């Protein structure tokens, strides 16, 4: 698939209309598609530089601040309208309720996720309680963020990486890398490293390196994101009806892991047909 479909806002949470659309990114699955992206960019702007970041496999949210104080948080929803989940976002410890600079207004975008260690603890508790366990950290993060009781969300060990400034008043920024450094200064969690390259071969090398580290990370990623760094160049490039033209997401192939065959169960159908079913030791993908 080349388009990630967003969810509609649920009636049980107050709807939030995003004043700046929370866009999705065009996906690429090959080096050839990435080079096509670079050619399109080079055809419109001179000497672009690209920031490369891991693509966190979580839930995209908007955080809003007035005079430096957190006032509202919402899900992406369909990009135009999301859900108000402020109460549940407030209990995520890595989300600052007050930032260092009392900016008149700030809206940032981030990805809420459940670290592997938290996921294992939550699943253990579910199994002990006889509940159906979450299938993966992304589902667990989604279920936890949409709890009606924020005290339950607080026990789930959620975290966030903030990766974009949607709107800002009281500060002028000129590039994506500058904005990420500023987000760190304000007190937000960002990814540890966000290198910036003019040489597209180095961009491709970085994407490969992120993929190699994928299995060692404490959180799930499903790709890497390439973004034009300069904000003026982004304005020139603009957007299609669906995606910004200044960014693209490279999607890694699904992870493969070895497991152990525990048993083979044979089921006999009504007509006597034997159907074997393999019982495998569970692994986290």
List where the protein language model places each region.
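RNA/tRNA-interacting regions in translation and RNA-turnover enzymes
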Residues: 1-285
């Amino acid at each position: 698939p080349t388009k990630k479909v967003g969810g509609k806002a649920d009636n049980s949470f107050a709807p939030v209309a995003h004043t700046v659309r929370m866009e999705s990114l065009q996906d690429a699955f090959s080096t050839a598609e990435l080079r096509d992206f670079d050619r399109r960019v080079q055809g419109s702007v001179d000497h672009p530089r690209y920031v490369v970041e891991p693509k966190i496999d979580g839930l995209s949210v908007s955080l809003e601040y007035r005079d430096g104080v957190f006032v509202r948080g919402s899900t992406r929803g369909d990009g135009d309208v999301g859900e108000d989940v402020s109460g549940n976002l407030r209990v995520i410890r890595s989300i600052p309720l007050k930032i260092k600079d009392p900016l008149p207004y700030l809206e940032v975008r981030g990805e809420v996720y459940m670290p592997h260690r938290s996921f294992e603890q939550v699943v253990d508790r579910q199994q002990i309680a006889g509940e159906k366990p979450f299938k993966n950290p992304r589902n667990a993060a989604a279920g936890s963020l949409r709890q009606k009781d924020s005290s339950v969300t607080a026990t789930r060990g959620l975290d966030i990486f903030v990766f974009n400034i949607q709107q800002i008043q009281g500060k002028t920024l000129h590039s994506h890398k500058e904005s990420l450094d500023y987000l760190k200064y304000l007190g937000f969690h960002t990814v540890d490293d966000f290198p910036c390259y003019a040489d597209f071969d180095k961009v491709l090398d970085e994407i490969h390196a992120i993929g190699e580290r994928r299995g060692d990370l404490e959180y799930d990623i499903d790709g890497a994101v390439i973004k034009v760094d300069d904000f003026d160049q982004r304005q020139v490039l603009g957007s299609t009806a669906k995606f910004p033209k200044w960014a693209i997401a490279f999607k890694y192939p699904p992870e493969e892991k070895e497991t152990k065959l525990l048993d083979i169960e044979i089921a006999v159908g009504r007509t006597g047909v034997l159907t074997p079913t393999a019982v495998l030791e569970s692994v986290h993908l």
